[in-house]
Amino acid sequence: MDIKKEYERWLANATADADVAAELKTLDDAKIEDAFYRDLDFGTGGLRGVIGAGTNRMNIYTVAKASQGLADYLKKNFAEPSVAIGYDSRIKSDVFAKVAAGVFAANGVKVSIWPVLMPVPTVSFATRYLHTSAGVMVTASHNPSKYNGYKVYGADGCQITTEAAAEILAEIEKLDIFADVKYSDFEAGLANGNVKYIPDEVYAAFVNEVKNQSVLFGEEVNKDVAIVYSPLNGTGLKPVTRTLKEMGYTNITVVKEQEQPDGNFPTCPYPNPEIKEAMALGMEYAKKCNADLLLATDPDCDRVGIAVKNKAGKYELLTGNQTGMLLLDYICCQRVKHGKMPTDPVMIKTIVTMDMGEQIATHYGLRTINVLTGFKFIGEQIGKLEKQGRADSYVFGFEESYGYLTGSYVRDKDGVDGAYMICEMFSYYATKGISLLDKLDELYKTYGYCLNTLHSYEFDGSAGFAKMQSIMQAFRGNIKAFGGKKVVKLLDYAYGLDGLPKSEVLKSLLEDDCSIVVRPSGTEPKLKIYISVSAENREAAEKVECEIVKDAEKWFA
């Protein structure tokens, strides 16, 4: 691509969006290069990028081009193509959703769109419930406010496969971004019936499916739990509070500053419940209210973070690994106790999620399926079980990045489900005088202490992209040890190990049951390092983990 010529073409043609047109006129040479040096990547996660002008940005033109390519793909593969669309609270999410709807409608693809912003799992659910050919969710999940994205689901409600993504990309690459995109007005589509709003009955059916995930099986628990909840200015407020209240949890305080949808995320620039800064305001509320439990969901409500009181009365944040282990153990224990464990039960987790999950699963007779990072791979495995007539064999799936799913009604992680099940689990143990931290200690005593941490490193722009590639190559080199722990084996998933698809992931198995995993983020210009340390106790584990991090960071120089 001739960057200068493409920039000038945009100056001449990108006039429909005033923001884009104005930004184009202000770009200097360096910014022009970054905005036009490539097209936004389209893969199994769809599109994700910074909102702005250019081929490497999220804007109405890149969204329309992707939608045209998807429409062409759907028309080739379905006699009567259709799509379900949703959007979150991010900047321009509603605009992008309506642009996508207009492109689909102009191409004869029937559109069902949520009338208001909704969590990402409701798009997976609506795709399945309405039997549409595909689903589209406009979201950038937990990324900072400057990002947005375009997530694509297949007819099964699971994110598209690698093969489907390649076919859609091939259609997109045939298109000229200005000359080849068909578009009809959104309001006109509503008037002529090519675009329809998804009815309330679908939302009610989704909430009922979440409620059906309960594993109390008639047991009575104390639901007078003081809950502080934050939707982090996203989509979770109505579905989470509705579900909790309908299940008997009425003592809910919502963090006022983070209650209403706001794509600027004014109180938490990085609205990710994995990060303690995003939980800080909720923690303040919890202290003021003397809450039993703090819950927070990310903007598209597919991740849940929690905090509970320790014995000293101070609030502790639990990691995604810890919450996932607790949920897995609780669900399995309840199913076994009530005779509700299915035949050949299955637990699914990602390869960067702590191995203790597999130990817990084995204890209860579950088979563990390990998949690549990304909940789409968990959804894909649920789909395989469904095709075998064994969807009920799926018991639980989780990933360390705060994503959980307890049923097969959707094919993506569900923060509404996660929030409810965490509250139920908390109530169950509280009724017996047991805290979640007590239960966690019990699991550590049974299976051994294990510390799992995640470290992220940002590399912006084209230079940053090249730097990440060079670091990955360095980690493929002959590194003998990290933090004094010898490398026993290097697993390079770029070669498709263990029957998994090829992926840019490196895992170094270290002595003493420790490991380090390095991979580029699929959604941001970041490298992620996952460290797992087994030790006698937390203090010893933290010391080893610190030394491993120091050694790993030397390769970033």
Question: Predicted segment positions?
Answer:
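An N-terminal, well-structured beta->alpha segment
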Residues: 2-100, 107, 187-224, 235
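Gly/Ser/Thr-enriched, mixed-charge loops and adjacent short helices
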Residues: 31-40, 148-280, 284-286
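Conserved phosphate/anionic-ligand binding catalytic regions in large, soluble enzymes, centered on
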Residues: 36-56, 140-141, 227, 231-243, ...
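Short glycine-rich or small-residue beta-strand-to-loop segments that form or flank ligand, phosphate
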Residues: 82-88, 226-229, 405, 532
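N-terminal small/polar loop signature for handling phosphorylated ligands or for N-terminal nucleophile
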Residues: 84-147, 246-305
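Short Gly/Thr/Asp-enriched flexible loops that form oxyanion-binding sites at enzyme active sites
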Residues: 95-104, 147-154, 302-321, 357-360
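Glycine-rich phosphate-binding loop plus the immediately following alpha-helix
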Residues: 153-183, 321-344, 349-358, 427
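Phosphate-binding and adjacent anionic-ligand microenvironments
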Residues: 287, 291-293, 314-316, 334-520, ...
